[in-house]
């Protein structure tokens, strides 16, 4: 039996949050076309406790974003946090007939609180948003559960406190 410290003790279940993140990652690999090496790497060996694996991947690959809703292909749209398989099909079908707005995306089931950092509609982002890893991660954590900002271990957390100026458009 392996006595590695990173394993749960005998008779102890694995941490539920970790189990849930592994389930989400499995789902991404089965239905969204992700590879295990894309979700975790030598540099990033574990999942973030506060954001899901799809968001974590997107934040780590900001060079691929923002994605234009009107022109992005099926597999590119699948990689956008907040957009699932049903929403991708609806987007591709609807954009053949009209330009899509953020209101249209919301009606189609897109979770805009996650997707807004990674998409454009007609060349425009929903808000004046910085494509910055720390900024986006901070806002994703806050949007998921506002109390997460209080739960985060301040010693290991590199995320900065949100500023009122983050919400003011120039």
PLM features: residue spans?
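Flexible glycine/acidic-rich beta-alpha junction loops that bind and position SAM and/or redox cofactors
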Residues: 1-16, 32-61
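Anionic-ligand-binding alpha/beta catalytic cores of soluble enzymes and soluble regulatory domains
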Residues: 18-21
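Conserved, mostly hydrophobic/aromatic
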Residues: 25, 91
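C-terminal extensions
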Residues: 46-76, 102-170
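Residue-level signature of tetratricopeptide-repeat
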Residues: 94-95
